[in-house]
Structure formats: structure tokens, C-alpha cells
């Protein structure tokens, strides 16, 4: 894999774009494809790029004519209908992932809203369809709020809960290996990947679970980061959500997928349906 930052062999320039580490190498975004052809001397070139395989319609309800175009705006600002639709979509996103795997399931649980919602839905679905408890895992420093609140959520959901207590030294020591696993030097991505990698390593070594649910994507989708409170208006809020989602495969999804997959596990992110 190409993971260097230096352009070769002609120029010794560092690329400041953390999305594409090499200036002469371009990534093909997920869900797209490029068409390569040869010229008259047999040299390959990109004829078409970033062609989309499939794109989900804005609203399946609108596409199914269940909502008339004239009443679309009323539908969008109807809080009750919006919340009901969001809940239905999230429940279906969890259900289809639970029902299409025969491998043991576990959930990453930080005690926050996003992971707790996913854990609750997964626990309910597994209990109703398989009659089993799910395993939940939380990682954190001794005395951290994550451990405390995850413990409370796990108790409420009646899960088989495990805590991985680590030290600051454990986190720092894991950074070189994490960089190799996720193939990224992006500071925020690396920092956020360490916990994912360590908890996944623990699961891989101590559990039969192979399919790992998490709450990734909710902050980008719902504007969950603290700086969203500074948005000037709903339009700017929405623009920032769309910007984050358009690049999420370079950062949060990359972190979630590679740090978990590097331990032989499969990540599931229902919020990103």
C-alpha cells in the first residue's frame, strides 16, 4: 500500500492534503468507479472518473408518492412525523444488519447517546430474534466518565458488559501500530482510532464476537459536535453536516473500518444508512 507523504521520483514536495498522501495518486471515493482506456500507443489513462453506482433518493417516502410534492415542506417541518421516520429508518438499519449475519454480535458502548441508542436497538433485536444477550464493551482510563455511564446503560439493557481499563502509556504505545493499521497520519483520525483498535484487539483475543456495532456517523449526520452550537442559522448547520458526511470515508469511517477490521472483526455503522 502507498502510505508515504513524499512525491517520487521527480519532486521532493510534501503534500499538505491529508486526504491524498501522494500528489500523483488519487483515491476513488466509495460507491464510485472510474473507467480506464488505452491511447494509440497503449498507455492507460482515466477516461471517466467518480461515476456513481447508486445513490439513495432524498426520501423514499416522497419517491413512493406517500407524500405529495405540494405538502413536502409541511412534512419536513412536522416534528412528530420526522422523529417517527428517523426512528423507523434507524430501527430498520439495525434490523437488517442483525438479521443478515450468522456471526456473534457485540456492541461498542461509550455511554453516550449515539452508541447507547445502537446498543439498545441491537439488544432488543437479538433478544427477540435469537433469545440471547449481547456483549457490550467500553474502553477508558481508570475513573473515566465513559466507563461509568456505559456501566449504567449496560445494566439498564441487561447486556454482558466488559470494561477495558487502560493507562495513558497503553494509548501512547499503540499509536505507531494504529498508524500502520489505518494507513493515515491525520492527527484527529489517529487519536480517535487508538481506543477503537485497543478495544477491538481485546474483543478479538477474548470473545467469539465478530460483528461489531457502533454509533459512528451520528455526530456528522445530526450535528453532534460542540462547534455546531455556533452555527449562524439552520442553513449553515445543514451545510456543515453535508460537508462532514461528504468526507467521512476519509476520516471516521476509515477509522472505524480499518481499526476494527485489522483485528479480524467487521464494523457495522447503522447511522450511516
Predicted regions and their residues:
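Conserved glycine-rich, hydrophobic/aromatic-active-site segments
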Residues: 94, 98, 178-272
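Amphipathic coiled-coil/heptad-repeat helices and related helical stalk/stem segments
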Residues: 146, 171, 195-196, 273
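Cysteine-centered catalytic environments shared across enzyme families
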Residues: 1-184
Amino acid at each position: 500500500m502507498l502510505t508515504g507523504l513524499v512525491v517520487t521520483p521527480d519532486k521532493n514536495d510534501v503534500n499538505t492534503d491529508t486526504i491524498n498522501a501522494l500528489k500523483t495518486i488519487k483515491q476513488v471515493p466509495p460507491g464510485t468507479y472510474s473507467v480506464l482506456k488505452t491511447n494509440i500507443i497503449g498507455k492507460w489513462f482515466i477516461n471517466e472518473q467518480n461515476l456513481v453506482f447508486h445513490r439513495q433518493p432524498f426520501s423514499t417516502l416522497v419517491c413512493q408518492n406517500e407524500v405529495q410534492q405540494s405538502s413536502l415542506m409541511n412534512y419536513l417541518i412536522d416534528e412528530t412525523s420526522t422523529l417517527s421516520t428517523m426512528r423507523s429508518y434507524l430501527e430498520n438499519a439495525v434490523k437488517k444488519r442483525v438479521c443478515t449475519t450468522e456471526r456473534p454480535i457485540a456492541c461498542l458502548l461509550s455511554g453516550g447517546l449515539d452508541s447507547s441508542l445502537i446498543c439498545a436497538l441491537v439488544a432488543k433485536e437479538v433478544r427477540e430474534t435469537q433469545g440471547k444477550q449481547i456483549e457490550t464493551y467500553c474502553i477508558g482510563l481508570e475513573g473515566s466518565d465513559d466507563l461509568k455511564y456505559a456501566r449504567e446503560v449496560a445494566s439498564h439493557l441487561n447486556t454482558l458488559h466488559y470494561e477495558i481499563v487502560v493507562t495513558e502509556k497503553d494509548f501512547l504505545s499503540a499509536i505507531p501500530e494504529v498508524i500502520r493499521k489505518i494507513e493515515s497520519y491525520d492527527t484527529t483520525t489517529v487519536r480517535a482510532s487508538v481506543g477503537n483498535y485497543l478495544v477491538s484487539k481485546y474483543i478479538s483475543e477474548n470473545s467469539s464476537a465478530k460483528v461489531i456495532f457502533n454509533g459512528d456517523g451520528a455526530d456528522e449526520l445530526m450535528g453532534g459536535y460542540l462547534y455546531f452550537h455556533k452555527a449562524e442559522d439552520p442553513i449553515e448547520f445543514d451545510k456543515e453536516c453535508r460537508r462532514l458526511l461528504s468526507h467521512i470515508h476519509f476520516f471516521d469511517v476509515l477509522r472505524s473500518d480499518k481499526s476494527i477490521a485489522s483485528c479480524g472483526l467487521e464494523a457495522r455503522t447503522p447511522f450511516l444508512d
